């Protein structure tokens, strides 16, 4: 089997490459933006085909699909930061909505149509009403930020194309996924990086934090990519699947876990610059549907992921 990973140069893409290549023995092709590098620890990069691709150029997508002729396509390319979406909404809409439509339109032009997985986010559900958690796929999305709104739009478009044109397209709503090598744009990586820098003496023993009361559903990225691969085998076209742990935890509890693993005393300060204009109070997944389709459930504990992420940033701070 041959898998094409669109946007494989990022955090999740690297883990997906490793899983598909090393664990499943698939042929893997990765796309990246021009001038961006792809390096996956533990994978012989000579065995991976890497191609430049701008998903805002539809004809380039069509040409690549016809050249590669993949069996499976994982669409990971996205502007995936909520904070960046507030600062640059136009870019977020272009990449997440226009880019998604370009891929769907390119699929329509192919004679041999591959199976495709569009990656969305638990942020799509937005403002959850009392009694709606854990969140099922049938919950009405009420996106609370620009990033989430673009992913809702992408999900709806993918569903319409699957139904109208018979495309073998599935969608996931992946809740917060974390692990070593994640950019510090995201909360766990940010906290771990700050702690590691403090331990190394590279900054004052003060942590800057945002909203600590928000509750989120965290899953190790290695479990997440395993779910993606299982859905390629067993998921149903036109369907959306939640990927998460099924348990929400307050950000303040995440912070406590990280600080418990630290070797120094650290003071915590709320930084107004880190507070979002709107923040969803709780996001927690119901993962019954993906379990029934694939048998998937997370295997790596949150404590293990946090410990390994902190150790990763310690090596970067030496």
Q: What are the residue ranges of the model-derived segments?
A:
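Amphipathic terminal alpha-helices
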Residues: 302-318
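NAD(P)H-binding glycine-rich loop region in Rossmannoid oxidoreductase-like domains
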Residues: 55-95
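Catalytic helix-loop patch of NAD(P)-dependent Rossmann-fold dehydrogenases
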Residues: 87-105, 115, 123-171
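Mid/C-terminal beta-alpha module of Rossmann-like enzyme folds, strongest
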Residues: 191, 234-275
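NAD(P)-dependent short-chain dehydrogenase/reductase
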Residues: 128-134, 156-217, 221-230, 246-248, ...
């Amino acid at each position: 089997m041959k898998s094409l990973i669109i946007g494989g140069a990022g955090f999740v893409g690297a883990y997906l490459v490793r899983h598909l290549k090393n664990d499943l023995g698939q042929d893997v092709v990765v796309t990246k933006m021009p001038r961006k590098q792809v390096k996956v620890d533990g994978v012989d990069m000579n065995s991976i085909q890497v191609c430049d691709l701008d998903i805002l150029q539809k004809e380039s997508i069509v040409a690549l699909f016809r050249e590669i002729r993949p069996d499976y396509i994982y669409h990971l390319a996205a502007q995936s930061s909520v904070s960046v979406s507030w600062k640059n909404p136009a870019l977020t809409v272009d990449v997440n909505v226009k880019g998604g439509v370009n891929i769907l339109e390119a699929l329509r032009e192919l004679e041999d149509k591959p199976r495709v997985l569009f990656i969305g986010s638990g942020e799509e559900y937005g403002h959850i009403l009392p009694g709606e958690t854990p969140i099922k796929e049938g919950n009405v999305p009420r996106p609370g930020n620009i990033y989430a709104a673009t992913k809702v739009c992408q999900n709806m478009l993918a569903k319409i194309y699957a139904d109208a044109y018979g495309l073998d397209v599935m969608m996931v709503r992946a809740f917060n996924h974390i692990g070593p090598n994640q950019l510090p744009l995201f909360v766990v990586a940010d906290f771990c990086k700050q702690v590691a820098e403090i331990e190394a003496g590279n900054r004052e023993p003060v942590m800057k934090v945002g909203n600590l009361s928000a509750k989120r559903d965290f899953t190790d990225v290695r479990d997440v990519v395993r779910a993606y691969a299982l859905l390629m085998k067993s998921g149903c076209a036109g369907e959306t699947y939640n990927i998460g742990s099924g348990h929400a935890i307050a950000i303040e509890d995440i912070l406590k876990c990280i600080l418990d693993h630290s070797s120094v005393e650290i003071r915590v300060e709320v930084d107004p610059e880190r507070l979002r204009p709107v923040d969803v109070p709780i996001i927690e997944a119901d993962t019954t549907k993906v379990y029934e389709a694939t048998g998937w459930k997370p295997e790596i504990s949150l404590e293990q992921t946090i410990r390994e992420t902190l150790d990763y940033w310690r090596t970067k701070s030496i």
